[in-house]
Amino acid sequence: MDPQRSPLLEVKGNIELKRPLIKAPSQLPLSGSRLKRRPDQMEDGLEPEKKRTRGLGATTKITTSHPRVPSLTTVPQTQGQTTAQKVSKKTGPRCSTAIATGLKNQKPVPAVPVQKSGTSGVPPMAGGKKPSKRPAWDLKGQLCDLNAELKRCRERTQTLDQENQQLQDQLRDAQQQVKALGTERTTLEGHLAKVQAQAEQGQQELKNLRACVLELEERLSTQEGLVQELQKKQVELQEERRGLMSQLEEKERRLQTSEAALSSSQAEVASLRQETVAQAALLTEREERLHGLEMERRRLHNQLQELKGNIRVFCRVRPVLPGEPTPPPGLLLFPSGPGGPSDPPTRLSLSRSDERRGTLSGAPAPPTRHDFSFDRVFPPGSGQDEVFEEIAMLVQSALDGYPVCIFAYGQTGSGKTFTMEGGPGGDPQLEGLIPRALRHLFSVAQELSGQGWTYSFVASYVEIYNETVRDLLATGTRKGQGGECEIRRAGPGSEELTVTNARYVPVSCEKEVDALLHLARQNRAVARTAQNERSSRSHSVFQLQISGEHSSRGLQCGAPLSLVDLAGSERLDPGLALGPGERERLRETQAINSSLSTLGLVIMALSNKESHVPYRNSKLTYLLQNSLGGSAKMLMFVNISPLEENVSESLNSLRFASKVNQCVIGTAQANRK
């Protein structure tokens, strides 16, 4: 029998589903080789698609006017299975749009031919009973059976063709309905989105309107409170207005009274102006007289200082310090002056005994007394304030334009540094001449500012150690740097001397001066000697350059004030062995004695009016050249020790001071322009 293609096979050749179709029972006998997929596997494959398709109806419920397609007709089941079993059950009205689109876009697949049944297999009987097996020789019976079977197969094929046609019609209707439902669903979803957007917009507008209403209600409440407050304030302002009106009336009455008084005052002012002009003229005349009196005071002050001598010598004896032996009675005597004990002492008597001298009887010779007379002698009980009171007028001469030089001379440990700088601890009673002199200058300059004078002060502080000039105001990195300090003239043809690489610090108050003195005290060279635990081994020179100006009269003056603390010296026993430290002290002593000898030679040369004064023989005298000349005022403090062991050195110092006191260097000249 020629095998014919079944309509179901044609459908399978044109449509290939991704999921197995609904199993349909068939009455065709099974072929020799059964299909590989079992019915239960086909049902399992359909389950996900069924759930997805049915889920569409559960998720989105769409109401449509299209009629539903009737369900597929159930195909009666037969003993065998054919390719019609692969037709899907999801061809009803619930098929999704995805299945319909997949069916439409599938490419046709070649039809699978129906396998021929084996010759050994005999299909079952229609009644379910097995036909009896014919003998092999009954070919006619076998042919009849085959013809009957063929007839039944043709009838079943015809029935299946009809069923297949019905299924195809139902499938087309379902696909059309799915497509229409998909279109309608898309339209409804778009409409739903618009409606939802409009609803959300309406909700937002409603929310905004409610917030606006709340805000307006709050503003209304605030405005009502403000209106009440303004009404209250209006009442207060009306009360205040009535009060101000009454005050205005009172002010108008007082204004009329004031205008009358003003007229009287204007007449009085005119009279006062005339009187002021007269007073101004009188004040100008008084200022002229005051200026003349000030110049006369300066002249008389200078004349008084000249009468006292341009070189004056004061002697000061320091007190005995704790731990030192008490000097014998009569070692130092201070005879009274011509006016009796009330006059300040000006004489000093020193007693010296020489054990090498004796009488013919072998008894020691009586002590020898040495009498000295100076401009002023300060006993051990004299305080720092008493000492400064004697030199205050001399210091003030520096403001008048006269160069002034004050220096302390004496042996090591005689109190020179104490006299010039003061004692440690910052006790005001122990302040030396330098801080007291500057305080006095600042005070007098402040008083003279009322007469039109303005002063400026520039300080410098150097030491001369072994004929080397060092800056005592060097700080930080400036110490030991910048080269050696040298004494130079300020400019070509200038008589003013300056120290290179040294600091010149403007000062205007006591605190600045105290800071400079503290710094210099730390930098000064000191060493232990036989006479003093800390002995100054250098000459310290504090110089204050004073510049004054009277701008309205065009007057200028300027002069240096030099305050010098000379180095102390002591004699070394030549019989002692000199170690490294003693050799260094010996070189220092030689340099100190050399500079002090040069200072004495300079003073003697000035006193003798010699043509050549050896200023350059020593750095000390060269630096003080402008303060030692004929135009300067000079004061020498000779400091001596009260101890008996220092009598020899004290006697040498007093003899040197006595020679200086006998010198006269001429009349001082003020530096004025």
Swiss-Prot record:
PROSITE patterns: KINESIN_MOTOR_1, KINESIN_MOTOR_2. The modification Phosphothreonine is found at residue 359. Residues 142-306 form a coiled coil. CDD domains: KISc_C_terminal. GO terms for biological process: cell division; microtubule-based movement; mitotic metaphase chromosome alignment; mitotic sister chromatid segregation; mitotic spindle assembly; spermatogenesis. Residues 310-663 form the Kinesin motor domain. The modification Phosphoserine is found at residues 6, 26, 31, 33. Residues 60-86 have a biased composition (Polar residues). Keywords: ATP-binding, Cell cycle, Cell division, Coiled coil, Cytoplasm, Cytoskeleton, Endosome, Microtubule, Mitosis, Motor protein, Nucleotide-binding, Nucleus, Phosphoprotein. It is found in: Nucleus; Cytoplasm, Cytoskeleton, Microtubule organizing center, Centrosome; Cytoplasm, Cytoskeleton, Spindle; Early endosome. SUPFAM superfamilies: P-loop containing nucleoside triphosphate hydrolases (SSF52540). Residues 23-94, 109-136, 325-372 are annotated as: Disordered. ATP binds at residues 410-417. GO terms for cellular component: centrosome; cytoplasm; early endosome; kinesin complex; membrane; microtubule; microtubule organizing center; mitotic spindle. Pfam families: Kinesin (PF00225). The keyword Cell cycle applies. Minus end-directed microtubule-dependent motor required for bipolar spindle formation. May contribute to movement of early endocytic vesicles. Regulates cilium formation and structure. HeLa cells lacking KIFC1 show multipolar mitotic spindles and a defect in chromosome congression and chromosome alignment during mitosis. Belongs to the TRAFAC class myosin-kinesin ATPase superfamily. Kinesin family. NCD subfamily. This is Kinesin-like protein KIFC1. It comes from Homo sapiens.
